[in-house]
Amino acid sequence: MRVVILGSGVVGVASAWYLSQAGHDVTVIDRQPGPAEETSAANAGQISPGYAAPWAAPGVPLKAIKWMFQRHAPLAIGLDGTSFQLKWMWQMLRNCDTRHYMENKGRMVRLAEYSRDCLKALRDTTGIQYEGRQGGTLQLFRTAKQYENATRDIAVLEDAGVPYQLLEAKRLAEVEPALAEVSHKLTGGLRLPNDETGDCQLFTTRLAAMAEQAGVTFRFNTAVDALLHEGDRIAGVKCGDEIIKGDAYVMAFGSYSTAMLKGLVDIPVYPLKGYSLTIPIAQEDGAPVSTILDETYKIAITRFDQRIRVGGMAEIVGFNKTLLQPRRETLEMVVRDLFPRGGHVEQATFWTGLRPMTPDGTPVVGRTAYKNLWLNTGHGTLGWTMACGSGQLISDLISGRTPAIPYDDLAVARYSPGFTPARPQHLHGAHN
């Protein structure tokens, strides 16, 4: 089968790899000159299934109001003048109760755990290297309340069979020795030993090269103007004067998927702006060993080989990619506060990207009402974490194989009135 994939970020390239391995003739189209040039370029580097959770959570609406008046707030909102933004925020607000949070987090963890397993299998099979580490994730708490609230997430982890350690402040240095210098600022942490890290752009670039060697065609520097349709099928992809045809089409354009699908499929995917710093390591014993997540500021600090990646924050401001100095100052403040000797912060590279976010935090993976149009987008801050699992899942669905995990509640149909999953959702399916 000829499959055309729109997008060469980590999700699009992973989809191309698994579809090619399933025997399909795959073409990837992207306006950029190479893979992973946008959202996948400089993310936080975490592969953290256990911390897969929606931004829509109990208490967030009240916190959002408080954050409006804080200098280092993790969330900021700026109206972009569109009704779509207002509708999206309203849908997100409706997901901020406990029932929706647990449901959304459950399916996110399911897909993320499965994806981590797929990544491990890919690594074992191909030997792909991407400055990856398997040292786990450590979520840091600065207040007693944060430490106490960890029990809510632990319940989901236990249901999913995800190993964890709840650590008091005095034990944090056992996991991250450099934290011994700042343990007095912390109340404890939640460690997930099975989580991983790695350079997403490096992984995507190398996987794309492997996919090309396996027969995948990459059409870079090729802008997509429109999807053409005839009846209930997509007839081709219009790129200037050229029409590229396939038997199946996969939309993996991230935040740009919504506009490209306008008039065909309504998907609630909105750009969530984030920032990162990439910092050369100064002192090995002052740098992180793996990755930490600061619960207060929602900022991740991740160790690559000789670099530290600091990433986080969320701005609901549309497609504005302006680099704001106050955001850089927040990232610098957090990394200096926790790892004061770790990196040459003054030499950092500052970056911003747009994460494709759904109101419920769960990506949109599956077929649309068009019989040959498939979606693999809306992964938000978890594109790197979920890429391999989403790629394998979309490959299985297009190939007519039964996926290893429940999947019907990942499709865009869940936003339709009266939608009910067709089968029970067992998180343990992520380990099948």
UniProtKB/Swiss-Prot annotation:
Reaction(s) the record says it catalyses: a D-alpha-amino acid + A + H2O = a 2-oxocarboxylate + AH2 + NH4(+)
Enzyme class: oxidoreductase
Keywords: FAD, Flavoprotein, Oxidoreductase
Summary of the function given for this chain in its UniProt record: Oxidative deamination of D-amino acids.
Family: Belongs to the DadA oxidoreductase family.
PANTHER family reported for this sequence: D-AMINO ACID DEHYDROGENASE, SARCOSINE DEHYDROGENASE-RELATED
The protein, known as: D-amino acid dehydrogenase
Gene: dadA
